[in-house]
UniProtKB/Swiss-Prot annotation:
Keywords: Ribonucleoprotein, Ribosome biogenesis, rRNA processing. This is Ribosome biogenesis protein Nop10. One of its GO terms (cellular component) is ribonucleoprotein complex. It comes from the Archaea. The gene is nop10.
């Protein structure tokens, strides 16, 4: 009873398995990361996100 809901990164289907039953792609945690005001890596995450937006 320790299974958690997972979401396929490719086709956005929810499953309890490690891989998607439709496409076989790996599934991950559908929840966003926890927010903490004392986020030690927030600066680096924002820089990375900014770089991704510039290349898109």
């Amino acid at each position: 009873m320790g299974n958690k809901l997972r979401k396929c990164t490719q086709c956005n289907i929810y499953t309890l398995k490690d891989n998607c039953p439709e496409c076989g792609e790996s599934s991950g945690n559908p929840l966003p990361a926890r927010f903490s005001p004392l986020d030690t890596y927030g600066k680096y995450r924002r820089i990375s996100k900014k770089r991704e937006m510039e290349h898109a």
